[in-house]
Amino acid sequence: MNPNQALWEKGDFTHIAAATRESGQALVERIGITRGMKVLDLGCGDGTTALPAARLGAEVTGVDISRPLVRAATERAREAGLTNIRFQQGDACDLDGIPDHAFDLVMSIFGAMFAPRPFDVARAMVRVTQPGGRIVMGNWIPNDPTLVAQILRISAAYSPPPSE
């Protein structure tokens, strides 16, 4: 098993995902999603941004490395009666099985930023975005005062730099 996948499958991250739903909704409201757009939510968790995008009429695919989060997202979409959304387990570093230029919009809020190889993620995001499409990310920032940002800052001091 991919070590990053093993990490994200160790705990119940739906509680953290629930805490980010307001941020996910706010992002979706600001990025101009329209009916029929093809949208990829990368590091989708339990559907934090994917579900609001689907409610606007977009055709949404959510990808997350964690099988439990993919199951939770699928269940939330079913409970909401959304049929224009699907979720799949996958690695943001390569997006195997997703064709080139498949999406009008690729978005990730508090998801892709955790991938161990950020340059691979960036390449994959560009590859699956249509020419003229958009990539939108919501990430914690270096001077963010939140507890999570402080934990990440401390962890970074003891972590090797990402490989290119």
List each model region and its residues.
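Class I SAM-dependent methyltransferase SAM/SAH-binding core
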Residues: 38-95, 120
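Conserved class I S-adenosyl-L-methionine
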Residues: 1-37, 48, 72, 152
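A short acidic, Gly/Pro-enriched loop at the edge of an enzyme's catalytic core
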Residues: 93-106
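A short SAM/SAH-binding and catalytic strip from SAM-dependent methyltransferases
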Residues: 104-119, 141
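Conserved catalytic/acceptor-binding region of the Class I
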Residues: 119-120, 126, 134-164
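Helix-to-beta-strand junctions that scaffold the AdoMet/dcAdoMet cofactor pocket
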Residues: 115-116, 129-131
